[in-house]
Amino acid sequence: SATPFYRLFASGMHEVLGLNFHKGSLYAVQRGELTKLTDQNGDGSADHYQNIANWELEGNYHEYSYGPVFDAQDNMYLTFNVAWVGFGEAKLSKWRGWMVKVSPDGTLSPVASGLRSPAGVMMNSAGDIFYTENQGDWVGSGRITHLEKGDFAGHASSLVWSNEPGSPMTTQITDVPDNSEPMYKAAEKVKNLKLPAVWYPHTLMGISTADMIEDVNGNMGPFFKGQYFVSDQGHSKVMRMMLEKINGQYQGICFPFREGWQSGLLRLSWGNDGSMFGGMTSRGWGSTGKDLFGLQRMLWSGETPFEMAEVHAMSDGFEITFTKPVDVSTAIQSANYDINSFNYQYHHFYGSPVIENKSHAIKAILISDDHTKVRLILDEARRFYIHEIKPRGVKAVNGELLLHEVGYYTLNNVPAGMTADLSKNKMAVVAPPPAESHQHAAVPMETTAEPATKKNSKNSNKHLTTMPSDWATPDKTLVIGTVPGMKYDVTELEVKAGTKIKLTFNNLDDDMTHNLVIVEPGTADEVGLSAFSLGVKGSQMSYVPNSNKVLFHTTLLQPEASQTIYFVAPSKPGEYSIVCTYPGHHTLMRGILKVVK
């Protein structure tokens, strides 16, 4: 509409986090109730509120509830958060951490367990249910999982209810290994542990996976028809996802798509005109979109940029389909691709660093006759690992660069099939061995403390955690902490030029990972974007880029951690920027180090 307006339809609701319009009525999931709202007299307002089902609440702030999703028999599916008491806790009220089914008569029955913060739940055109998950305890990074009856999605706390009548499983908390190995290792021992269909690498593909919708009509262009769009609350953006089934199991790849929404993007819905509506909030959690709430819509412009449209797993690597024919001279060069694989730890701790990272050599490259498909034959495709695929140097035939140069493929299964016959493909090139500088051994990145900084040698003298031996004492001691919402608790610090500074950074009042980086005046955006471009390798550098704009920094600190650094204040007076360069944080988390004479 050229003149959009709001109209009150229903009131007195308790934290509605899900709506669905079905057969003439709105169904709302409140914190503790599934409510059917009907306008019986046609005046534009609900006049009949029907309690379809309700459930226990303890009163913990984290007991969010989501849905409903309808199946063909009018059953409704809901997902429940675990409570948060410093860790995810399901035992405070029944069925927390579960997906449940509500029949048309209101009967509630459990379906699947292991959920932590399942903000999005949807059923695709094939009738399969997926849910979105947020990083936290037992969840190394954001992810999307296909749920079926009896599945355990990973959060062990929910298993406290597995012995209840109606439970489709008998798995116990004590059955779940808690040894920080990758999740697929635990799945070898816990047979109903469901691996994610697609991992969303934390910070690189958002920080708070929220909702997902399927584009069955090609609303965002014909190349993306049948794919999915996923929202992220913390990074205020939409990402794109392609799924395929290998050996009966979903897997696929996620790509960046559209950033810059005005607030935290929580809900997605298609409009009648094919536009994508986004419902937004930043209540309680910060977001890169600075508004507290909002409603926006996105329309396809009618033009498709040069992108990776699809990536398919092959028996010996991956095949990339581009939206436009490639320039063969760039697509045939192995140096124009970076392929890395990595994983996350599965444990009760909050989140996970990247582990078992490996750079892959390209053995051969095959280009289709129409120049739209490029097949990469790798030294190894690692089953159960996330593969970062970056054809960053490939151009379209018209010279156009990729709008988004990275995708993250979750390889749950390697498809069977014949390996490529290079001799029969006129556009096949056997790739030469990469130069020594491009050969990387598998580098475990299990800490983000001192060892990571030592690898980042250009920055090593910018990160001193012991007082220099020639100092008798610091001239000034500074302390800066964090507050919820991706903010430092101090926005300005003042020091004299050339003074000896002891600075302690306390990451004690937020539940996110942060660092503290002091940079040249006016360069916070530049340094923040450089940190983001490091990709998966950034975690071993604490997301501090090798830049002469970086003056001093801490390493990445997990929640409840502190670090002290020592430095001499710049000799030139000015307002030096303090910024967190953890991807997605640099636009919000800032301060000023004011240097005076």
What are these regions (language model features)?
Residues G302-E307, D327, P391-K455:
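Acidic, Ser/Thr/Gly/Pro-rich low-complexity segments and short DxT(G/T)-type signature motifs
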Residues S1, T491-I518, Q563-S577, L593-V595:
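Beta-strand cores of secreted/periplasmic/IMS beta-sandwich domains, seen most often
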Residues G302-E303, W471-I501, D509:
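N-terminal edge beta-strand
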